[in-house]
Amino acid sequence: MPSYQFPDDFQWGAATAAYQIEGAASEDGRKPSVWDSFSAIAGRTLNGDSGAIACDHYHRYESDVKLMVELGIRHYRFSIAWPRIVPDGRGSVNEAGVDFYKRLVDCLIRHGITPHATLFHWDSPQALEDQYGSWRNRQIAHDFAEYVSAIVSRLGDRVQHWMTINEIPCFTHLGYSANQTPPHAPGTRVGSSKEVWQTSHHALLAHGLACQAIRAASPGPCSVSLVDNIAVTVPITESEADIAAAQQAFPHCWLNGGIVFPALTGAYHAGFLEQLGSAAPEIQTGDLEIIHQPLDRLGLNIYTGTYVRAIDQAPGYECLDLPQGYPRLHMPWLNFVPECLYWGIRHISETVGRPDLPIWITENGCAAQDVLDAKGEVIDTDRILYLRQHLRAAQRAVAEGYPLKGYFVWSLMDNFEWAWGYDRRFGIVYTDYRTQQRIPKASFGWYAECIRQNRVV
């Protein structure tokens, strides 16, 4: 029987995001983000929920870090709220906001946990939306780089591992739309698909300028990465033909050819640009050089995948619909395709052509229909099933020599799930939002045992 063992230096961690857990939305100089404003619009989030209080992590971080110690992780991925650091998006730095992250990081380090800081996880300052329309304007890339310089120069003596931006597609192509009101903040309708693609191009520019800013501002050695939620094409059989079809489909699946390809290769995928036609963004001279910064690692957020097979007509592949009754977790898009972790990693090395680039799974997990039983426990065996099968796929990638170096479960605790409010629970710790009590679920103990044994149990 396979042991599903990981290398001794494999990094086990957990991940969160600022707006989803911190709360304290108007404390210590923080000003509104686009998510504060979006959540205040009737009907935009389920039950009118917002992140104003969330998990109150801002006040409870010390006890949350103790949970991490109990779990056994040595790596924690969190995000820094731009509106806490530069409340107006540009200009003066709010040192009280910086001090919170200093306290958090110091607490992590005292407990032997390495901090991994994401500099942007969707909560851009509302002031920049009011001033020039956020990601519709190239100026945001420069303002983001200034904010990055400010926080890295202040935290770089404590934090070595920096992630620039989390999931560009979600706050651009799910936040802007030409023909409908988009589901994500700031929920902006624009005039054309080209304008939507311009927002993601500006986000790529922000990533590139942030890479430069991190390396210029860091007082010591640092590691720089991007976090992308690639769409993963999975061959329905591992025949030579179906593998080739999945690789052929990968640049054309969702936004891959226009996000991960320019970031990692310095060019939008040629076939993808042709597919976009007049919707392709305007690319100014020098943009691609800025976007294509050297990375020390790549973070992949992977939850599901799309099955693909070879066909005998153009384009040579077919993306397959899933049948009615196919297993799914507690989100409409969260189909159970555990091979996605293996193929996502393999596609970066082979399909994108970056076998040199170390990879971390920076998010993987699932929403489940968690309830407290009569004993006050959450026995989330569905989540354990999901995580076990995905981690087996990750271990396969390691065993075959692909450069997977670490894994961060999403998420440490139940939290504000964006437009779904508090209805969907992704945590391995149950959050009672009324009392702010934290209750480790069965999956918490299971994951702790994986970490303890350094293998999939």
List the model feature ranges, each with a label:
Residues 46-60, 136-138:
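Active-site mouth loops of central-metabolism enzymes
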